[in-house]
From Swiss-Prot:
Region spans: Disordered: 99-120, 306-336, 397-439
Coiled coil: none
Keywords: Antiport, Calcium, Calcium transport, Cell membrane, Glycoprotein, Ion transport, Membrane, Phosphoprotein, Potassium, Potassium transport, Repeat, Sodium, Sodium transport, Symport, Transmembrane, Transmembrane helix, Transport
Topology class, membrane: Multi-pass membrane protein
Reactions this protein catalyses: Ca(2+)(out) + K(+)(out) + 4 Na(+)(in) = Ca(2+)(in) + K(+)(in) + 4 Na(+)(out)
Protein name: Sodium/potassium/calcium exchanger 2
Glycosylation, residue list: N111
InterPro entries: K/Na/Ca-exchanger, NaCa_Exmemb, NCX_ion-bd_dom_sf
Residues exposed to the Extracellular side: 60-132, 200-204, 265, 519-533, 591-602, 652-661
Biased composition (Polar residues): 415-439
Protein's job: Calcium, potassium:sodium antiporter that transports 1 Ca(2+) and 1 K(+) in exchange for 4 Na(+). Required for learming and memory by regulating neuronal Ca(2+), which is essential for the development of synaptic plasticity.
Family classification: Belongs to the Ca(2+):cation antiporter (CaCA) (TC 2.A.19) family. SLC24A subfamily.
Length: 661
């Protein structure tokens, strides 16, 4: 038995040395593991610098005004040229039916800020104390809430939604467009609710618009830059999602023309989302029909194979060989990216060093904790890969014997995915023989364990071994521990029956974290002279989209460019057709069907700018010949920087919106 295992390990070592199967080599250093974090930090720094730089004038003027007497009111400010930078003013006196916000509390007099005073508790620090350095605590708290929202969504909310879809028997396409989209966009949705009912400002709309641009431009740019190879995109997923998104944006622009949102307009936007869900139900059938109509007159060239298959008797004598590394094919929809198997939580990335840039070691696209495995675990992991490839090889050989084909392409469905193909192509020279089939005795029990490993890993509070991980663990422990105590982890088989508690409990925690995030963002903006709308367009939009950014980069590095692009657009469809109209509809129902005031020329221009950026994205992808290369990545970053600069200039009234309503 020892000789047999030694022979198997030697074979595994040779297999790992093969260049075509280098997926299980540990060749990533700590420096490369931190590469993504450094790049994200660089771009977030650029966003913050660009935001602050264009608000210096407003900051200095606000500081001058704050040192005056408390008798200075907003009327003289207007006479002195002090502008109010806001996208949405629900307190517009022209609209008699709009409720007025509560009066400013003591210590928060009108001379201290030009922001809309929402229903926030009184800050323990005064405005002067915050400007002298206390605002750093608010910035840290806001970033802390970004991490908290990511953890509660990825570790509890999305897994509970996965259980719900399994209980209801919903297909992956529909689940991805409904429940999983809600899980990924929950922070934006609750930010919109808080903006309508609590903040009485446009922070929710600004966050959704900014998140939409971030997903389209920044996420696609990161995927193009960090992909391992040039990814060829197919037209159908992009055409499908962009078509729905364009229609939704046009509807939104039309509804904004009269400065109010009626209840039936909100209902129409929700209906548009329902139509998208119905379409996703029949997505596969529609795609086949459309492609058949397009290719019905297309001439297909058929060539005979260059070599005939070996006779079955001769082939049976051959030793089994390992094929080349499986290559992931494109064609995935947004449903595949938003399931819990594909989403690698930020807690796992921070604590367990699950490198988002590392080569996938698991079977068919599942990242594993390879670095933290024991020697036995690593052996079982390699054995499971070899076992599955050997099983596919047996099916390939059988089909070749039956059909006489020289090469065979087998399509395999990824877990929780409906349209992602894996192409298994036998390799003639880049493979090592497995001698005497000795693997069969050592991996009989590995398959059952592999099936368990492929399930989403439950939350672990085990104490890390490295110092850096221990520091990170202590930082996030105040977030993780209350969640671990109050929410059952449905990824454990014994806790799956408690999924309703996890579902509603996660919603409660998301609401709390979103409220704290918006409140502290309001305090930061009030202190340095940046409106809530700019905070939503830049900082909040990027912070709430970081988990989707990491997931999209991981998927793009696996070769699934279509899945990353489609998910970026698909999540925006949910934000526009649910994240915005649902709070509006609830507001109109509560206030006896009174319309919601959106009297804002800046917001209208921001949505039009978003529409223009979407057209630029389509044009850029077409100019790059439907390939995700480095050039496309730099174009996306350039467009995102242009959007940030123009948005800030519009909010500061340095530029005037050319589109008037």
């Amino acid at each position: 038995m020892d000789l047999q295992q030694s022979t198997t390990i030697t074979s595994l070592e040779k297999w790992c040395l093969d260049e075509s199967l280098s997926g299980c080599r540990r060749h990533y250093s700590v420096k490369k593991k931190l590469k993504l974090i450094r790049v994200l930090g660089l771009f977030m720094g650029l966003v913050a610098i660009s935001t602050v730089s264009f608000s210096i004038s407003a900051f200095s003027e606000t500081d001058t005004q704050s040192t005056g007497e408390a008798s200075v009111v907003s009327g003289p400010r207007v006479a002195q040229g002090y502008h109010q930078r806001t996208l949405l003013d629900l307190n517009d006196k022209i609209l008699d039916y709009t409720p007025q916000p509560p009066l400013s509390k003591e210590g928060e007099s009108e001379n201290s800020t030009d922001h809309a005073q929402g229903d926030y508790p009184k800050d323990i620090f005064s405005l002067e104390e915050r400007r002298k350095g206390a605002i750093i605590l608010h910035v840290i708290g806001m970033i802390y809430m970004f991490i908290a929202l990511a953890i509660v969504c990825d570790e509890f909310f999305v897994p509970s939604l996965t259980v719900i879809t399994e209980k209801l028997g919903i297909s992956d396409d529909v689940a991805g467009a409904t429940f999983m989209a809600a899980g990924g966009s929950a922070p934006e949705l609750f930010t919109s609710l808080i903006g309508v009912f609590i903040a009485h400002s446009n922070v929710g709309i600004g966050t959704i618009v900014g998140s939409a641009v971030f997903n389209i431009l920044f996420v696609i740019g990161m995927c193009a830059l960090f992909s391992r190879e040039i990814l060829n995109l197919t037209w159908w997923p992009l055409f499908r999602d962009v078509s729905f998104y364009i229609v939704d944006l046009i509807m939104l622009i039309i509804f904004f023309l009269d400065n109010v949102i009626m209840w039936w307009e909100s209902l129409l936007l929700l209906t548009a989302y329902f139509c998208y869900v119905v379409f996703m139900k029949f997505n596969v059938q529609v795609e086949k029909w459309v492609k058949q109509m397009i290719n019905r007159n297309k001439v297909v060239k058929v060539t005979a194979p260059e070599a005939q298959a070996k006779p079955s008797a001769a082939r049976d004598k051959d030793e089994p060989t390992l094929p080349a590394k499986p290559r992931l094919q494109r064609g995935g929809s947004s449903a595949s990216l938003h399931n819990s198997l594909m989403r690698n939580s930020i807690f796992q990335l921070m604590i367990h060093t699950l490198d988002p840039l590392a080569e996938e070691l698991g079977s068919y696209g599942k990242l594993k904790y390879y670095d933290t495995m024991t020697e036995e675990g690593r052996f079982r992991e390699k054995a499971s890969i070899l076992h599955k490839i050997a099983k596919k090889k047996c099916h390939v050989d059988e089909n070749e014997r039956q059909n006489g084909a020289a090469n065979h392409v087998e399509k395999i469905e990824l877990p929780n995915s409906t349209s992602t193909d894996v192409e298994m192509t036998p390799s003639s020279d880049a493979s090592e023989p497995v001698q005497n089939g000795n693997l069969s005795h050592n991996i009989e029990g590995a398959e059952a364990q592999t099936a368990d490993e492929e399930e989403d890993q439950p939350l672990s509070l085990a104490w890390p071994s490295e110092t850096r991980k221990q520091v990170t663990f202590l930082i996030v422990f105040p977030i993780v521990f209350p969640l671990w105590i109050t929410l059952p982890d449905v990824r454990k088989p014994s806790s799956r029956k408690f999924f309703p508690i996890t579902f509603f409990g996660s919603i409660t925690w998301i609401a709390v974290f979103s409220y704290l995030m918006v409140w502290w963002a309001h305090q930061v903006g009030e202190t340095i002279g940046i409106s809530e709308e700019i905070m939503g367009l830049t900082i909040l939009a990027a912070g709430t989209s970081i988990p989707d950014l990491i997931t999209s980069v991981i998927v793009a590095r696996k070769g699934l460019g279509d899945m990353a692009v489609s998910s970026s657009v698909g999540s925006n469809i949910f934000d526009i057709t649910v994240g915005l109209p649902l709070p509006w509809l609830l507001y109109t129902v509560i206030h006896r069907f009174q319309p919601v005031a959106v009297s804002s020329n800046g917001l209208f221009c921001a949505i039009v700018l978003l529409f223009i950026m979407l057209l630029f994205v389509i044009l850029s992808i077409a100019l790059c010949k439907w390939r995700m290369n480095k050039i496309l990545g730099f174009i996306m970053f350039g467009l995102y920087f242009v959007f940030l600069v123009v948005s800030v200039l519009l909010e500061d009234r340095i530029l005037t919106c050319p589109v008037s309503i």
